[in-house]
Amino acid sequence: MAKNKEIRINVTLECTNCANNSQKSSRGISRYITQKNRRNTPNRLELNKFCPYCVGHTVHKEIKK
């Protein structure tokens, strides 16, 4: 009997502002781990989260592991 893929999966969200910063003036890249429902959100997840390196709320996008 085959098992189905889990509906809820863990995803990693990464700050787009820190990741695309060409000057590398920030000390690091902000990352959050959260869960998403694969059926309800089949596309990549984007949330506004607080980035301690940018010192403000920025868009965090889902990245591949």
UniProtKB/Swiss-Prot annotation:
PANTHER family: 50S RIBOSOMAL PROTEIN L33, CHLOROPLASTIC, LARGE RIBOSOMAL SUBUNIT PROTEIN BL33C. GO terms for molecular function: structural constituent of ribosome. This is Large ribosomal subunit protein bL33c. It comes from Zygnema circumcarinatum. One of its GO terms (biological process) is translation. It comes from the Eukaryota. GO terms for cellular component: chloroplast; ribonucleoprotein complex; ribosome. SUPFAM superfamilies: Zn-binding ribosomal proteins.
